[in-house]
Structures are given as structure tokens and as C-alpha cells.
Swiss-Prot record:
Zn(2+) binds at residues 179, 181, 192. Keywords: Hydrolase, Metal-binding, Metalloprotease, Protease, Zinc. Residues 108-230 form the MPN domain. This is UPF0758 protein ESA_04094.
Length: 230
């Protein structure tokens, strides 16, 4: 582990282990701590970067919790200043923009995990309730994603007829529904369940499958399909 001095303080730098591991085996072989350490590059006075990465992930519980946090919780971690906070906010925003910029025809939602990650990138930071529909072809490739309805902090009005009309226009074989709960709690309301039933019945009339409805909170989600509601 190398160290350098700055204005009387010792800044502990990362050794080349995680970088060398990435170059030799690929990024997928690295742990969350190792990837985070590569991005942060240096630790804080008296703390090497791997220890800092582990401490950050333990404090916030997950990568999602870390990258979506505001500045206040960082003040509880000694030595983490505005520069480190800015780095973390930048990587979170880059991840969201990466998902948004991927061409639709290259994005196939082949697993619940991919679907959840994709939708979290679209919805987790929204300050109002929005209702998004992903229109899919027969191979589960995205034809288009549309935010069809936008509401208030606690409610969004959804019209099944408009969803069906757009699905037919796009010749979609299936759709995935999603909306966010800005409050942070992902548990669906009774109204969420009722509107989902109405959409499913409307889509059945034109032979379009509703594959799932995901409710996205802060650091949590609920899948109607996983709970057996669809």
C-alpha cells in the first residue's frame, strides 16, 4: 500500500491489486468494494481506499443506498469531504445515463434482475409519481419505453385504454408496467392492485401479455409477478 503526503497529512493510496485484477480477469470478477476503490482512487487521512470503500458500503447498506444518498449521511463518516461525495454522485448519474442511452433494440429484458435495475435507473430519483410502460417484442426486446402518466407526490392517474392503444400501435407482444413511490416505500396500494387488474384485463382482449408491474421505492421494489399477482 503506497502513501503520499499533502499539507502535513498522509493520504493512503490504493495499491494496484484491484486494477491489476480488473485488467487480468475483467470488471465482473471484482467485488463491489474493489470496483468502488478503483473509482475513488485514494483514501482519506489515515484510511486506505479499500477500507474506505468497505466502510461506505457497510454504512449505506448497498451500492444503491450509497449512490442515491444525499450529503447529510456523509457527514457521519470522518474524512469524507465534498470531493468524494461529488465523485459518488457522478458515478450514480453516469450509471443512470448509461441505461437511458442504450439503443432500445439492444436492450433485452431477459431476467427480473435486469428489469429491476433498468427501471430503478429510470424511476428511483423521480420526485413525483410517474407511470412508465415498457413495450416489448416477442423476444422481450424493448420497442419503446414511455412515461405515459405523471402525477403528484403521492398519486398518479392511469388510463388502461391509453396503454392498450399505444401497445397496439407499436405492435407490442407484451408490456411491463412500472411506477415509483417517492415516499420510498415500495409496497403497492389497493389502488395499485386494482389498476393493474384493469390493465391486464384490457390487454387480454387484444392478446397482449402484461409480464409484470414493478413498484420502485428507495432501495426497495415490489414485483407483482414475483408475488404471483400477475
Amino acid at each position: 500500500m503506497a502513501a503520499r503526503h499533502r499539507a502535513g497529512k498522509t493520504i493512503v493510496k490504493m495499491d494496484n491489486g484491484p486494477r491489476e485484477k480488473l485488467m487480468r480477469y475483467g470488471a465482473a470478477d471484482l467485488s463491489d468494494e474493489e470496483l468502488l476503490a478503483i473509482f475513488l482512487r485514494t483514501g482519506t487521512p489515515g484510511m486506505d481506499v479499500m477500507t474506505l470503500a468497505k466502510r461506505l458500503l457497510a454504512h449505506f447498506g448497498s451500492l444503491y443506498g450509497l449512490l442515491s444518498a444525499d450529503i447529510r449521511p456523509f457527514r457521519d463518516i470522518g474524512g469524507v469531504g465534498m470531493a468524494k461525495y461529488a465523485q459518488l454522485k457522478a458515478i450514480g448519474e453516469l450509471a443512470r445515463r448509461y441505461y437511458r442511452s442504450r439503443p432500445c433494440e439492444e436492450t433485452a429484458l431477459l431476467s427480473p434482475t435486469i428489469t429491476r435495475d433498468f427501471l430503478e435507473s429510470q424511476l428511483a430519483e423521480q420526485e413525483r409519481e410517474v407511470f412508465l410502460v415498457i413495450f416489448l417484442d416477442s423476444q422481450n426486446r424493448i420497442i419503446r419505453q414511455n412515461t405515459l402518466f405523471t402525477g403528484t407526490l403521492s398519486h398518479v392517474e392511469v388510463h388502461p385504454r391509453e396503454i392498450v392503444r399505444e401497445a397496439v400501435r407499436l405492435n407490442a407482444a407484451g408490456i411491463i408496467l412500472a411506477h415509483n413511490h417517492p415516499s420510498g416505500r415500495a409496497e403497492p396500494s389497493r389502488a395499485d392492485k386494482m389498476v393493474t387488474e384493469r390493465i391486464v384485463k384490457s390487454c387480454q382482449l387484444v392478446d397482449i401479455r402484461v409480464l409484470d408491474h414493478l413498484v420502485i421505492g428507495r432501495g426497495e421494489y415490489v414485483s407483482f409477478a414475483e408475488r404471483g399477482w400477475i
